[in-house]
Amino acid sequence: MLTRQQKELIVKEMSEIFKKTSLILFADFLGFTVADLTELRSRLREKYGDGARFRVVKNTLLNLALKNAEYEGYEEFLKGPTAVLYVTEGDPVEAVKIIYNFYKDKKADLSRLKGGFLEGKKFTAEEVENIAKLPSKEELYAMLVGRVKAPITGLVFALSGILRNLVYVLNAIKEKKSE
């Protein structure tokens, strides 16, 4: 049992985290073993280090922390047993992918991913799958570079073709003059 002072400390800590986080995702964790949750935390730690956490916190404490961090419309997520995934560093979409794939791998009901906030915007359980299917920041950068690079590559090939043709014409003129 936590003392009042410990609870106040948790609320203060969570409020500060929620003010600077890019992702808050609420999930029902019942049915998972301690080993399962340890595996999920390991996957997150492998990708994010200390930049992401999956934490079980009492709903009353989460409610106070979210209220202090000035979030609105979160009450629907705090029904039943609730764990919270939050990301303070790195790509938040990748964290959604990790937990979504974890639930899929464990054959858990995906609706148990209750929803949350991505970059301050609320999303529902139904939208979790759509977010998980978004490309990561690295993939988006690669697509952007590919799109920028394609016209430049085309220009290089066009210019090299013109130069090649010029060389052929000059060689033909040289051969004609040498005859």
From Swiss-Prot:
InterPro entries the record matches: Ribosomal_uL10, Ribosomal_uL10-like_sf, Ribosomal_uL10_bac, Ribosomal_uL10_bac_type, Ribosomal_uL10_CS_bac
GO annotation, cellular component aspect: cytosolic large ribosomal subunit
GO biological process, one term: translation
Entry keyword set: Ribonucleoprotein, Ribosomal protein, RNA-binding, rRNA-binding
Keyword match Thylakoid: no
Disulfide bonds, paired cysteine numbers: none
One function term, GO molecular function aspect: structural constituent of ribosome
Pfam families the UniProt entry points to: Ribosomal_L10 (PF00466)
Region of interest: Binds L7/L12 dimers: 137-179
Record Gene3D superfamilies: 3.30.70.1730, 6.10.250.290
Record text on subunit structure and interactions: Part of the ribosomal stalk of the 50S ribosomal subunit. The N-terminus interacts with L11 and 23S rRNA to form the base of the stalk. The C-terminus forms an elongated spine to which 3 L12 dimers bind in a sequential fashion forming a heptameric L10(L12)2(L12)2(L12)2 complex.
Biological role: Forms part of the ribosomal stalk, playing a central role in the interaction of the ribosome with GTP-bound translation factors (such as IF-2, EF-Tu, EF-G and RF3).
Protein family membership: Belongs to the universal ribosomal protein uL10 family.
Name listed for the protein in its UniProt record: Large ribosomal subunit protein uL10
Species per Swiss-Prot/TrEMBL record: Thermotoga maritima (strain ATCC 43589 / DSM 3109 / JCM 10099 / NBRC 100826 / MSB8)
Gene (name only): rplJ
